[in-house]
């Protein structure tokens, strides 16, 4: 809550008219007072003094995860509890998209063909839309 370079950046942002936010774990921390949108998560003292990766760091990560998840939902990237418009930037996400597609569309059982469709379309939702618009696709 008192790191000088963070306080300096917050001040520069304020001078430039850039809105700022922060997540802090100490009530009324200077950083929270300097930010436009502070989030104070009072976790109390750490079990091991000086080890902020425990309660404080974990609580901040949870807050960031909640914000990120909420944004994904608001942007229409989630249907039910499935991420259907994720950017497929690695093998894990491609595999997950294939499994989600096959779960949502059980008539498609050939994993490799589903994978080709997912890669062509770019997401689960776009693959489903592509199938609806082109009934002659070989899948």
Show where each model-derived region lies.
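Glycine-rich phosphate-binding loops that contact phosphosugars or nucleotide phosphates
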Residues: 1-62, 68-75
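Glycine-rich beta-alpha junction loops
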Residues: 27, 43-45, 87-90, 121-122
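Internal, active-site/partner-interface "lid" segment
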Residues: 65, 69-105, 111, 118
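NTP-binding/hydrolysis catalytic cores, primarily Walker-type P-loop NTPases
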Residues: 105-139
């Amino acid at each position: 809550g008192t790191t000088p370079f963070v306080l300096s950046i917050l001040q520069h942002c304020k001078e430039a008219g850039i809105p700022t936010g922060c997540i802090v774990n100490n009530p009324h921390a200077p950083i929270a007072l300097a930010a436009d949108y502070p989030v104070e998560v009072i976790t109390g003292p750490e079990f091991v003094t000086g080890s902020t990766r425990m309660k404080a760091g974990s609580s901040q990560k949870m807050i960031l995860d909640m914000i990120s998840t909420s944004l994904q939902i608001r942007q229409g990237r989630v249907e039910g509890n499935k991420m259907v418009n994720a950017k497929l930037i690695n093998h894990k996400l491609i595999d997950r998209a294939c499994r989600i597609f096959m779960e949502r569309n059980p008539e498609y059982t050939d994993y490799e063909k589903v994978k080709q469709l997912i890669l062509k379309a770019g997401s689960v939702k776009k693959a489903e839309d592509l199938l609806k618009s082109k009934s002659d696709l070989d899948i």
